[in-house]
Amino acid sequence: MKAPARAAVGSRGIRALVLVMLGLLAILTFFPFYMMVIQATHTSEEILTTPPPLGPGVHSLHNYAKVVAVVPFWRNFLNSVIVSSSITALTLLFCSLGGYAFAVYQFPLKRVLFATLLGTMMLPWLVDLIPWFIIVTRLHWLNSFLALVVPSAVSAFGVFWMRQYISSNVPLELLDAARIDGCPEGLIFFRVVVPILTPALAALAIMNFLPSWNSFFYPLLVLTKAKVMTLPLVLNLLHGDPYRGMDYGVLMTATTMALAPVMIVFWLAARRFISGMTAGAIKG
């Protein structure tokens, strides 16, 4: 066999091996989600059988009825939508403005402020819990959405991310041309810069929406009333009595309902997310 033929065979073999590995990785990734959806259609007794059921059952409506009977699920669902959407919108606004300022303008102590901002990224997030809890308590924000939204309205990583993207993708000549035409600074940002930032904004939106939707520990500290709780706290209430056992079918139903919006948002914005991450990695 000639060298080119051997190289072609070796290339096809490597490609087949890569495809097999990717297939196995995909199965390992999605199988837990598949089991979650399947178990949402079974009772707890059926789930605990050996081997567990791998096909859909007939108790999905029964489990759903128990979920909405035990907790105000849809009210808590709306709470999560409001909190996560507010955090994401404010993060996009403030981080894009901060990144734009660091990328375009010159002002005193610019490097010092940016270095300080990056330094805060090295601190564990647990360090902020006690100061924020004290602030929220003194402002009488306990059991309100403000206690969740305000501390998360801006992130150091978001400012850094937008600053890097703007520095690499927004030409200063374009901004100068807009100023020559008499465009105010605010309109330059919203009409000239923001359309260029669409991939970066989409990526940042997903990176902030998912953690805010899944946040558990901090909301557990500042929310104690069921009517203002977010979905992760409600799922915790559905665990039931650990000594008498929990209803796994009900818990899996609520978990599936809670994860569905997150999966839909990610799938709809996946292309934007990938393009934003790729642009930031290549040009940043």
Which stretches of residues belong to each language-model region?
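Short, Lys/Arg-rich, polar N-terminal cytosolic tail immediately upstream
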Residues: 1-10
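A structural signal for multi-pass alpha-helical bundles of membrane permease subunits
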Residues: 14-284
